[in-house]
């Protein structure tokens, strides 16, 4: 079989203006950027306001291997499958971060014959939205250190007299806004800024700082959760950057930088229209990770797509304990749009990996033996799929299981897995998806199952409500969302929680950051663990995004590169063609 990039290059694509017309957009509602991508104006929503919304289908998965189990392949393949059975469909996915593209996972455009195209444009820069988020974020960092420098150098009274501004009296030990970069670079996790020659302060005042990956920026979460430009401006204004020496929060509005940050991001609020290999319109927008952020594409993209099509297929990152949980408890609260159907992606290799009989690690290839018939491993790993089915069903959303077939999978094991699912829960539809190898044609049975599931009434139920305390919300996600026995807060987390309550942030949602490779907070614990503790080492306030962010276990907000990163395979030929991107 051809590589992903070769399949993409050998497939004729439509001009993006034709794709936009097919989607139902007027020519003045999008701005083409080249032949194959276009920015979609929010003015389209004004014209479409009276249109009835389509059905929202959220694709999630079992606990994945480090290489993923094909959620994006299934998302794109399902949208193509729906089009094959004459349903009006669009897909909405996140913009890939270049950190994973150059790191372990590679690209995030789907794969095989279920890709967003051109895949190299999607995976590398696209329309620069992540760059805009990075620049806006680091503008705030520059504003903080500049203000700290001038206030400390002159003294507060002299600063006020000279500048006409009110001194913020920043506590340099409590600057909570770290810098960001769209790369995996562990060396930048802890740094010192403002270093000077002896007895000089020209470079600012020395303090500890660090970098997160851009996908973990609160601005990325805001971009995914906002619904218009005015709301974007308000949310950015509420972002807490630091605290003063009286312990009060200082926001982007306090630093008078929120307006400039919003200006920097004004074009990034528009989703990017692209197409699948079969010409299905696809909106790309925002890119928060699901392990260290809320992990879903944007509300704006969903709103536009839901007005233009009968079925919108989107995805939440990693397993249902990660992106799907956050879709239900964070995204739905902001959008007020509940999912009509959930699709759980499972694979034979992923279930065997969850058996505990294989030692799989990020950055190392999967052993060939994982594709051999192994009933014991499949039965043991099936506990993980059972857990995810029960987890999704507790939100009372109609559920379909899609078994994503790899070329090495045996028909005997696929049939055995289908029967195991039916025996476990006859109410859950299950179909084998061959979207990777066959495109939409390989996902038509899955598409029929999704259409049927969407005809059922979704009695959506979140895990918690705004009026509950922050402790109750954290416990709800840990104990009900993960099946944990308890949650334990470090002394620092307890102190932060009390402070957030004092400053009036108790109504916010909670976003738990943990490993995606286990339902627990320990990556090596596979299957369907129970009776474990969720240790919260630190809490971060995302007042603009609307959630409290809990760092659990040893999760990092700046990834590192493996010993053999994906960038080693990337190159370019004499004609400008990129090679080695997958």
Swiss-Prot record:
Pfam family, any one: FTHFS
UniProt keyword Ligase, yes or no: yes
SUPFAM superfamilies (UniProt xref): P-loop containing nucleoside triphosphate hydrolases
Entry keyword set: ATP-binding, Ligase, Nucleotide-binding, One-carbon metabolism
Keyword hit for Phosphoprotein: no
Reaction(s) catalysed by this chain's protein: (6S)-5,6,7,8-tetrahydrofolate + formate + ATP = (6R)-10-formyltetrahydrofolate + ADP + phosphate
Family annotation (PROSITE patterns): FTHFS_1, FTHFS_2
Gene3D superfamilies to which the protein is assigned, alphabetical: Domain 2, N(10)-formyltetrahydrofolate synthetase, Formyltetrahydrofolate synthetase, domain 3, P-loop containing nucleotide triphosphate hydrolases
Annotated ATP binding sites: 65-72
Any one GO biological process: tetrahydrofolate interconversion
Example GO molecular function: ATP binding
CDD domains: FTHFS
Pathway(s) this gene product operates in, as recorded in its UniProt entry: One-carbon metabolism; tetrahydrofolate interconversion
Catalytic activity, EC: 6.3.4.3
Membrane-spanning ranges: none
Family: Belongs to the formate--tetrahydrofolate ligase family.
Protein name per the record: Formate--tetrahydrofolate ligase
Name of encoding gene: fhs
């Amino acid at each position: 079989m051809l590589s992903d990039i070769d399949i993409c290059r050998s497939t004729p694509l439509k001009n993006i203006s034709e794709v936009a017309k097919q989607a139902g957009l007027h020519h003045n509602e999008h701005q083409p950027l080249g032949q194959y991508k276009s920015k979609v104006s929010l003015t389209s929503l004004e014209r479409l306001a009276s249109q009835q919304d389509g059905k929202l289908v959220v694709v999630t998965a079992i606990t994945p291997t480090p290489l993923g189990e094909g959620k994006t392949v299934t998302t794109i393949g399902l949208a193509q499958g729906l089009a094959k059975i004459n349903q009006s469909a669009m897909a909405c996915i996140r913009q890939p971060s270049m950190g994973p593209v150059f790191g372990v996972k590679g690209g995030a455009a789907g794969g095989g014959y279920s890709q967003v195209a051109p895949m190299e444009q999607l995976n590398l820069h696209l329309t620069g939205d992540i760059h805009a988020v990075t620049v806006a974020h680091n503008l705030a960092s520059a504003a903080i250190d500049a203000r700290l420098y001038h206030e400390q150098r002159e003294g507060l009274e002299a600063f006020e007299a000279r500048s006409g501004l009110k001194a913020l009296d920043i506590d340099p030990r409590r600057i909570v806004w770290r810098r960001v970069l769209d790369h995996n670079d562990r060396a930048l996790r802890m740094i010192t800024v403002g270093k000077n020659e002896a007895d000089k302060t020209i470079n600012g005042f020395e303090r500890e700082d660090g970098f997160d990956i851009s996908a973990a920026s609160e601005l990325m979460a805001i971009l995914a959760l906002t619904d218009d430009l005015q709301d974007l401006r308000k949310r950015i204004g509420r972002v807490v950057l630091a605290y003063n020496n009286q312990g009060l929060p200082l926001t982007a509005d306090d630093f008078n930088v929120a307006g400039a940050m919003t200006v920097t991001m004004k074009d990034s609020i528009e989703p990017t229209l692209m197409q699948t290999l079969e010409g299905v319109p696809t909106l790309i927008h925002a890119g928060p990770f699901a392990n260290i952020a809320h992990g879903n594409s944007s509300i704006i993209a969903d709103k536009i797509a839901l007005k233009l099509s009968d079925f919108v297929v989107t995805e939440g990152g990693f397993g249902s304990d990660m992106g799907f949980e956050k879709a239900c408890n964070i995204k739905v609260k902001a959008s007020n749009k509940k999912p009509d159907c959930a699709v759980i992606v499972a694979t034979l290799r992923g279930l065997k990996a969850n058996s505990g009989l294989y030692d799989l690690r990020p950055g190392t290839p999967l052993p060939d033996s994982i594709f051999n018939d192994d009933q014991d491993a499949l039965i043991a790993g099936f506990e993980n799929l059972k857990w995810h089915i029960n987890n999704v069903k507790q939100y009372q959303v109609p559920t379909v299981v899609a078994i994503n077939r790899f070329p090495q999978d045996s028909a005997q094991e696929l049939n055995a897995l289908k029967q195991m699912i039916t025996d476990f829960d006859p109410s859950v539809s299950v179909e084998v998806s061959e979207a990777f190898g066959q495109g939409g044609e390989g996902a038509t049975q899955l598409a029929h199952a999704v259409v049927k599931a969407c005809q059922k009434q979704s009695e959506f139920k979140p895990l918690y409500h705004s009026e509950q305390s922050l402790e109750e919300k954290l416990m709800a996600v840990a104990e009900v969302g993960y099946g944990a026995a308890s949650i334990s807060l470090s002394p620092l987390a307890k102190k932060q929680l009390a402070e957030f309550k004092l400053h009036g942030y108790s109504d916010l949602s909670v976003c738990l950051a943990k490993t995606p490779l286990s339902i627990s907070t320990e990556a090596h614990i596979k299957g369907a663990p129970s009776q474990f503790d969720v240790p919260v080492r630190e809490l971060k306030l995302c007042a603009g995004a609307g959630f409290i962010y809990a760092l659990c276990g040893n999760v990092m907000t700046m990834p590192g590169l493996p010993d053999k990163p994906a960038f080693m395979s990337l190159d370019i030929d004499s004609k400008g063609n990129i090679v080695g991107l997958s």
